[in-house]
């Protein structure tokens, strides 16, 4: 056997060892080395991949943003003005469209006869109605409330009664004295009528008595004459 035909003994190849830093990540805040499975730092709870670099402010961009904020309000006013102008322009066009239709309607209407024109104008009818209304209102105003007639208004006594915060005034009136005089006059008139009836009955009785007394005397005188 030659030297080239010799085979090296079979040995398993060495596997590459995993690097010590593979899969681990350092926290950007506390520099703690966390495992690959952790998505947050186990000490400060900062998420994986957060950067602590402060952003640099660009002064030009800031100036442009401020200018845009203050410059944006005026444009809406122009839009409003444009809307108003458009509305003003549209109005006369609408009026033009409406006016011919109105004229057509007026032409289609029939002309009123002359008899309607000769009638009384509406102003006179309105004046008559208003006069009637005023007379009715005046009549209603003149109608006064019913008042007691047998009350003497001069004898008024007022009594004030207060219940809580409410005060009530009560007025007492006395009856008129005419009622008593009228009753006495009726009594006297009835008494006078009774006296007249009695006097008339007495006169009738006296007349009857005189007629009775006169007849026997005449008879007696006639008898005496015959005797003589």
Curated annotation (Swiss-Prot):
Listed Basic and acidic residues bias regions: 76-98, 113-122
Modification after translation (UniProt): Monoubiquitinated.
GO CC term, one of those recorded: nucleoplasm
Tissues where the protein occurs: Down-regulated in breast cancer tissues and in several breast cancer cell lines (at protein level). Widely expressed with highest levels in lymphoid tissues and placenta.
GO biological process, one term: negative regulation of proteasomal ubiquitin-dependent protein catabolic process
Chain intervals for the UniProt region annotation (Disordered): 1-21, 65-156, 172-228
Main location: nucleus
Notes on the domains: Intrinsically unstructured in the absence of binding partners. Folds upon binding to DNA or RNF2.
Protein's UniProt name: RING1 and YY1-binding protein
Name of encoding gene: RYBP
């Amino acid at each position: 056997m030659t030297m080239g035909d010799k085979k090296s003994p079979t040995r398993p190849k060495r596997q590459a060892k995993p690097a010590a830093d593979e899969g681990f990540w350092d926290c950007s805040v506390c520099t703690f080395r966390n495992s690959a499975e952790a998505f947050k730092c186990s000490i400060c709870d900062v998420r994986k991949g957060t950067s602590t670099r402060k952003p640099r402010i660009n002064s030009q961009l800031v100036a442009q943003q401020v200018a845009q904020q203050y410059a944006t309000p005026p444009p809406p006013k122009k839009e409003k003005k444009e809307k108003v102008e458009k509305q003003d322009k549209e109005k006369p066009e609408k009026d033009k469209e409406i006016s011919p239709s109105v004229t057509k309607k007026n032409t289609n209407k029939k002309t009123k006869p002359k008899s309607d024109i000769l009638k009384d104008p509406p102003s006179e009818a309105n004046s008559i109605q208003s006069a009637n209304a005023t007379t009715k209102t005046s009549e209603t105003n003149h109608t006064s409330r019913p008042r007691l007639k047998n009350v003497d208004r001069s004898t008024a006594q007022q009594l004030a009664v207060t219940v809580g915060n409410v005060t009530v005034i009560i007025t007492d009136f006395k009856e008129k004295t005419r009622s008593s005089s009228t009753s006495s006059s009726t009594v006297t008139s009835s008494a006078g009528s009774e006296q007249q009836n009695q006097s008339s009955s007495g006169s009738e009785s006296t007349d009857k008595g005189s007629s009775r007394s006169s007849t026997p005397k005449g008879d007696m005188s006639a008898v005496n004459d015959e005797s003589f």
